[in-house]
Design a protein with these regions (language model features):
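Long, contiguous binding/interaction regions
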Residues: 1-35, 41-101
Length: 101
């Protein structure tokens, strides 16, 4: 299924958009997602970051994969409807950057 509201970006477009995000963002192995790992002190802060990402995602209507553990929270965006990256992934990543710095 192709999502015409958020078409799949070309690799060059995605690379350009990635360069505008916090330096912590990187392409995942297959290039079909972007990911940022945020280091923090302790488990409670990792849970807080995960909840912050989840709350923000719910308000945006674009939900990342979020993993966390003691001292870290990882957020991964992709657009499943296009089997790759869309503008929405980069907008959501930029908004996450604004939240966590």
């Amino acid at each position: 299924m192709t999502d015409t509201r958020h078409p799949r970006l070309l690799a060059s477009e995605a690379a350009d958009k990635l360069s505008r995000l916090d330096a912590g963002w990187a392409f995942c192995e297959d290039g079909q997602a972007i990911e940022r790992r945020v280091e923090c002190k302790g488990f409670a802060k990792a849970v807080y970051l995960a909840n912050l990402a989840a709350y923000h995602a719910d308000r945006q209507g674009h939900h990342p994969d979020v993993t966390f553990g003691f001292g870290y929270c990882t957020v991964r965006y992709t657009t499943h409807d296009v089997d790759g990256l869309s503008e929405n992934d980069f907008q959501s990543a930029a908004a996450f950057d604004d939240l966590v710095g």
